[in-house]
Structure formats: structure tokens, C-alpha cells
């Protein structure tokens, strides 16, 4: 005698719900599929859990909305496991003729320092420091620079 799935409606009284319709009820041997492997009990429990969840969703729409919501943010671990090899952009080759060179600006100097520097150029290199100091002392007077005109008015001009 072939045992198959018995399809009949059974009304179960649950405390949360008035009546529940269940399909694929297990027959005499304990599982509903008739092959004797025993996985029918798990299916029966899963079906009851689904029925109870459906009843809870109907009673409480906020819970249903939370249960149906997707995971935020989506979990995608395979992107984090391996580094992504992005081909590098080839560097632009530049001609040495088109590369601009910095323009060297002469520092801002007052007239006294400029004149002293010009006067020092004709002196031997080992005596230039002493000559420059003597030049500043000799020429920094009111006759050469009346009312302080041409003298440094701030530290940056030295």
C-alpha cells in the first residue's frame, strides 16, 4: 500500500489566533512524505512557525515591517576579502623643454645694503665681511640718507 501525503484541512486552536489552516499534515508514520527519512517533523515544525509568524504579522504591522526590512547596509564580505587590483594610469611623459623653472627673485634690499654689496665686490673674498661692516658704519649717516630715506624701515629689507 503506497503511503502519500494526506491533504486535508485541520483547524488548530492557538491562543493568538482564532483558527489556522494547515496543509500537508503528517500521516501515520510521523513524516508527511512517506519515505521514512524523518525530515517531515522538521517541515511540520517549520510550517507551524510560519503560521505563528503570519499571525503575529497580521496583529502587529510594525513587527511585520521590521521583519521584512532588508539588512542595512547589505553585507558583502567578498569585496573586503581580496584587494581589488586597479590598473594604474600611465604617467604623462613631459619634455624638458616644456617644464617651467622657478624664477629666482632678488630679495628686497634697501639702498644702503645694495650700495654696500656693490662696493664689496671689488675687495678680496676674505676681507669682504670687515669691509662691508665698515662701509655701513661710514655711509649710514644723515648726509647720505636725509630724513632716513633709503634706510631699512623693517627687518625684511636687510
From Swiss-Prot:
Biased composition (Acidic residues): 30-42
Keyword S-adenosyl-L-methionine: no
InterPro entries, per database record: Soti (IPR031397)
Region (Disordered): 24-43
A single GO BP: sperm individualization
Keyword check for Ligase: no
Record keywords: Developmental protein, Differentiation, Spermatogenesis
Function as written in the Swiss-Prot or TrEMBL entry: Post-meiotically transcribed gene that has a role in late spermiogenesis; required for actin cone progression during spermatid individualization.
Membership in a protein family: Belongs to the male-specific scotti family.
UniProt protein name: Male-specific protein scotti
Protein species of origin: Drosophila virilis
Protein encoded by which gene: soti
Amino acid at each position: 500500500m503506497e503511503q502519500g501525503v494526506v491533504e486535508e484541512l485541520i483547524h488548530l486552536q492557538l491562543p493568538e489566533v482564532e483558527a489556522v489552516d494547515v496543509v500537508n499534515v503528517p500521516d501515520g508514520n510521523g513524516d508527511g512524505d512517506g519515505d521514512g527519512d524523518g525530515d517531515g517533523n522538521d517541515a511540520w515544525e517549520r510550517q507551524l512557525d510560519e503560521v505563528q509568524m503570519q499571525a503575529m504579522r497580521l496583529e502587529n504591522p510594525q513587527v511585520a515591517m521590521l521583519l521584512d526590512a532588508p539588512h542595512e547596509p547589505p553585507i558583502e564580505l567578498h569585496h573586503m576579502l581580496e584587494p581589488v587590483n586597479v590598473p594604474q594610469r600611465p604617467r604623462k611623459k613631459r619634455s624638458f623643454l616644456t617644464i617651467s623653472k622657478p624664477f629666482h627673485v632678488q630679495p628686497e634690499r634697501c639702498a644702503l645694503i645694495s650700495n654696500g654689496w656693490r662696493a664689496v665686490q671689488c675687495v678680496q673674498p676674505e676681507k669682504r665681511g670687515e669691509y662691508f661692516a665698515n662701509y655701513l658704519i661710514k655711509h649710514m649717516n644723515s648726509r647720505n640718507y636725509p630724513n632716513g630715506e633709503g634706510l631699512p624701515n623693517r627687518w625684511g629689507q636687510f
